């Protein structure tokens, strides 16, 4: 969802995106061009297309929703490095304006990037955007920059509805065979904690789901939205002619994440002290998250990837690390909160996060197939 902002704010974000892109390729226009992102000549517009009219259709053509977001932008960048042709599904004129100001694209999709306007709650526009693509990366999410936490109960409901529309559009579009869905680690970690209930797993892995009632009762709207959206996606894909994989990243960090991903980050950190105490607060570099998306997508082609994948780089264990996260995001740190965080650092964590499934996939593709696309259980 787009939000009107000041020209100065938008320009600062554009410059950060441009710098991050060039830095990722080693700097310089030549490096960007070699990877498929080229500076445009003069004031060339970003091309707007509709459905199959734009971008060469084929097995290396994919569509990315939310491609101008922090994660979506990194996924597009990584896809181009892997030789894919990408359609960016944009929702607002502001998103299109950002791309124009970046001047990183050539005309008529010559750089491997095309754009199409698509509303993730409108199945017809999604169908047109996906037509001719072999796969879809659904990275878009709803945020409410006017909200105190960056995310509201209404946003959670919208995200679940959008997930259903995206999957239905994928199923309806004949060319689409695979979908990589961006969820969150928060869809795995929030449950009512019964200290004496030995049935509750110590290891938190892809088999664990957050309890929607618990999230609702504690107003953990971001976690609720991600959990409900992912469950909705799995229900919609079950028994259909579509391969679905979900990536569940931890708090996504990286260059400029305070400006470019602040609302989602602040929403993610609601309840962070409890996660810190339980050993469940983790971070993931945006580059790691993007690479995970592409790697699972490619592994889906030979049935060596399926189900859910938890993605993180680092588990935050010390109060000092948590304080630094808050500082980077500009979150006021109250004395009581600081004391609570300090106390949590003195207690052993009750849970262990597990990322072995993704680690195995990222380390090698030469392994036996053991995943089942429709074995995800949450009911």
UniProtKB/Swiss-Prot annotation:
Q: Where is the signal peptide?
A: none
Any single Pfam family the record assigns to this protein? 3Beta_HSD
Specify which residues bind NADP(+) according to the UniProt entry for this protein: 66-72, 98, 119-120, 139-141, 226, 249-252
What is the uppermost EC class here?
A: oxidoreductase
- Keyword Oxidoreductase assigned to the entry: answer is yes
Q: Which GO terms describe its biological process?
A: defense response to bacterium; lignin biosynthetic process; steroid biosynthetic process
Q: What happens when the gene is disrupted?
A: No visible phenotype under normal growth conditions, but mutant plants have reduced lignin content and increased sugar extractability. Mutant plants show enhanced susceptibility to the bacterial blight pathogen Xanthomomas oryzae pv. oryzae (Xoo).
Molecular function in Gene Ontology: oxidoreductase activity, acting on the CH-OH group of donors, NAD or NADP as acceptor
Keyword terms, alphabetized: Lignin biosynthesis, NADP, Oxidoreductase, Plant defense
SUPFAM superfamilies of this UniProt entry? Answer: NAD(P)-binding Rossmann-fold domains
Where do the catalytic residues lie?
Answer: 226 (proton donor)
Known EC number: 1.2.-.-
- Similarity field: Belongs to the 3-beta-HSD family.
The protein's job, in short, is: Involved in defense response. Required for NPR1/NH1-mediated resistance to the bacterial blight pathogen Xanthomomas oryzae pv. oryzae (Xoo). Required for pathogenesis-related (PR) genes expression. May be involved in lignin biosynthesis.
Q: What is this protein called?
A: Cinnamoyl-CoA reductase-like SNL6
| Record organism | Oryza sativa subsp. japonica
What's the source species' lineage? Eukaryota, Viridiplantae, Streptophyta, Embryophyta, Tracheophyta
């Amino acid at each position: 969802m787009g939000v009107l902002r000041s020209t100065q704010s938008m320009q600062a974000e554009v410059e950060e995106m441009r710098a991050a892109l060039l830095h990722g390729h080693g700097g310089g226009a030549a490096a960007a061009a070699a990877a498929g992102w080229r500076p445009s000549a003069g004031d060339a517009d970003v091309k707007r297309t509709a459905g199959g009219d734009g971008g060469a259709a084929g097995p290396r053509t994919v569509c990315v929703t939310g491609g101008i977001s922090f994660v979506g932008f990194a996924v597009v960048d990584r896809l181009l490095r892997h030789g894919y042709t990408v359609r960016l599904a944009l929702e607002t004129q502001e998103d299109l304006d950002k791309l124009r100001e970046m001047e990183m694209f050539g005309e008529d999709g010559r750089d491997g990037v095309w754009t199409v306007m698509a509303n993730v709650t409108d199945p017809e526009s999604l169908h047109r955007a996906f037509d001719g693509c072999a796969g879809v990366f659904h990275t878009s999410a709803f945020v409410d920059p006017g909200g105190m936490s960056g995310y509201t109960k209404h946003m959670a409901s919208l995200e679940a509805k959008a997930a259903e529309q995206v999957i239905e559009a994928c199923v309806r579009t004949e060319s689409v065979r695979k979908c990589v869905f961006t969820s969150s680690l928060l869809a795995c970690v929030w449950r009512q904690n019964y200290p004496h209930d030995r049935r509750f797993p110590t290891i938190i892995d892809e088999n664990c789901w957050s309890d929607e009632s618990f999230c609702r009762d504690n107003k953990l709207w971001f976690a609720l939205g991600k959990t409900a959206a992912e469950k909705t996606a799995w229900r919609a894909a079950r028994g259909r002619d579509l391969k679905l994989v979900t990536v569940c990243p931890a708090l996504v960090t990286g260059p400029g994440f305070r400006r470019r991903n602040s609302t989602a980050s602040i929403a993610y950190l609601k309840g962070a002290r409890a996660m810190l105490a339980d050993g469940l607060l983790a971070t993931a570099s945006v580059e790691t998250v993007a690479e995970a998306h592409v790697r699972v997508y490619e592994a889906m082609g030979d049935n060596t990837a399926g189900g859910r994948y938890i993605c993180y780089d680092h588990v935050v264990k010390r109060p000092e690390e948590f304080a630094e996260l808050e500082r980077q995001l500009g979150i006021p740190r109250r004395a009581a909160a600081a004391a609570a965080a300090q106390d949590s650092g003195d207690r052993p964590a009750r849970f262990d996060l597990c990322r072995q499934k993704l680690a195995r996939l990222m380390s090698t593709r030469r392994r036996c197939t053991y995943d089942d696309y429709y074995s995800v259980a949450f009911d």
